[in-house]
Structure formats: C-alpha cells, structure tokens
Amino acid sequence: MSLLTEVETYVLSIVPSGPLKAQIAQRLEDVFAGKNTDLEALMEWLKTRPILSPLTKGILGFVFTLTVPSERGLQRRRFVQNALNGNGDPNNMDRAVKLYRKLKREITFHGAKEIALSYSAGALASCMGLIYNRMGAVTTESAFGLICATCEQIADSQHKSHRQMVTTTNPLIRHENRMVLASTTAKAMEQMAGSSEQAAEAMEVASQARQMVQAMRAIGTHPSSSTGLKNDLLENLQAYQKRMGVQMQRFK
C-alpha cells in the first residue's frame, strides 16, 4: 500500500458515510494525483461543508495544506487553527511540544505514527496545530504519520460507540436503528437508480420503503416490525443490479 493510499484510508475512516464522504474521497484522490491545485478554493469548499465535526475539518484542511502546492505567504485558515488547538488545554500543548520534538528527529511515516499513537487525541491535534501554524517543521512523511495516528484514535472511539449501539439490547434503539438504515439504503437506491427505464422499479421500491418508515414513525409500531427491512431493500437493489448486468454481492 502506498503512503498516500494509507493516508486516504485513515482520513476517510473518520468521515461519516453519505454523499459528502464520496465528495471528500474524490477530492483527496484529485489532490494526491496532483489534479487539484487551487488550495484556496479547496479550503473554502471544506469550510462550508455541513455534518463534519470541526476536528475532522481541521484534519482534512491540514492534509490539503500539506499536499497542495501553495504560495509561501498564503494565509492560514482560522477554522483549521481553531480545530487544532487541543481545546485550549495547556496540558495538551505541553504534550504536543514534547511530541513535536520527537517527530522532528523522525523522518519515516511509520516511525512517526508509532511515536504518535502513545499520545492522546488532544495532544495529537495540538501538535498538528503547531506544524500547521508554521511554529515547527517536520518532514511531510512524519506529518502524515501524525495525521494517521490521530485518525486511528478517533476511529477507535467511533467504533466502540458504534459497537455499543449495535449490541444494545434496548429494543427501541434497535428498532430506530433498523429504520434509519432502511431509510438510508432507500436513498442510496434512488441515487444509484439514475434515470434509465429499468430504474423505475427500483425507485418505486425505495420510495415505498421510505413512506413505510415515515408511517411507522408517525403511528408508532412494535419494535420487531422493522426486522429485516434493510435486508429486503438490499435484495431488491441486488436484483435490480443483476438485471442491469452489475454484480455486487457485498452490501450486507
């Protein structure tokens, strides 16, 4: 796996699934391929994206700044600086300075990542802030190692939270989660169906599913009524794809 592929993997792991994630993935691919060279426009686009947390925006802004060639005097962006200040905690800043001194002596991606993994997410963010604000300089590889270590810590905590929700025994939470997943799947079906004649059936199934979820929420239904709803939708989507000559078996 190449360095940039690894960076893209870690960064995308902390972005919530949805259409915005696909847009960010495309921009990362373009940036890493040297196709998108307007850093100012890229940062303005990132700043106005909804849903993303300030820290995720800060990390993405840092990645873009490291990768896209820019004028030496280009202003640093406030939304990135605010996100990478370690919540203003002086303890985070103290640890960030210690980490920075170690990273300065490290020139490899994996070496920097290993060092960074022993620090808290707040200290890692503060260290990125130091480098972003030009208060310190490390090799690009070391900076990428720092970014990936931060993403790994964030993704770990997100995974724990997700696992807690998936394994919860509370029937109301499980019921709502199944309906949310079914509704999201229906939206994806509508987007994938496009405008071909064969798409009408898939669109109809997706529309009916969304209406059903709305009705279930409006009238209140038994928690077991949503069981299998998402899988039924996915089976319909796969049947539609098969007719279109597309074979994708890994949705479930």
From Swiss-Prot:
Q: Where in the cell is it found?
A: Virion membrane; Host nucleus
Any idea which GO molecular function terms this record carries?
Answer: RNA binding; structural constituent of virion
**Alphabetical list of SMART domains matching this protein:** Flu_M1_C
Per the annotation, the residue ranges of the short sequence motif Nuclear localization signal are 101-105
Q: Where is this region: Membrane-binding?
A: 1-164
Q: Which GO terms describe its biological process?
A: viral budding from plasma membrane
Provide one Gene Ontology cellular component.
Answer: virion membrane
**InterPro entries associated with the record:** Flu_matrix_M1 (IPR036039), Flu_matrix_M1_C (IPR013188), Flu_matrix_M1_N (IPR001561), Flu_matrix_M1_N_sub1 (IPR015423), Flu_matrix_M1_N_sub2 (IPR015799), INFV_M1 (IPR037533)
Q: Which UniProt keywords apply?
A: Host nucleus, Membrane, RNA-binding, Viral matrix protein, Virion
Q: What is its main location?
A: virion
Using the UniProt annotation, give all residue ranges assigned to the region (RNP-binding): 165-252
> Topology in the membrane?
Peripheral membrane protein
Q: Which domain of life is it from?
A: Viruses
- Family label: Belongs to the influenza viruses Matrix protein M1 family.
- Its biological purpose: Plays critical roles in virus replication, from virus entry and uncoating to assembly and budding of the virus particle. M1 binding to ribonucleocapsids (RNPs) in nucleus seems to inhibit viral transcription. Interaction of viral NEP with M1-RNP is thought to promote nuclear export of the complex, which is targeted to the virion assembly site at the apical plasma membrane in polarized epithelial cells. Interactions with NA and HA may bring M1, a non-raft-associated protein, into lipid rafts. Forms a continuous shell on the inner side of the lipid bilayer in virion, where it binds the RNP. Determines the virion's shape: spherical or filamentous. Clinical isolates of influenza are characterized by the presence of significant proportion of filamentous virions, whereas after multiple passage on eggs or cell culture, virions have only spherical morphology. Filamentous virions are thought to be important to infect neighboring cells, and spherical virions more suited to spread through aerosol between hosts organisms.
How is the subunit organization of this protein annotated in UniProt? Homodimer and homomultimer. Interacts with NEP. Binds ribonucleocapsid by both interacting with genomic RNA and NP protein. May interact with HA and NA. Cannot bind NP without genomic RNA.
The name on file for this protein is Matrix protein 1
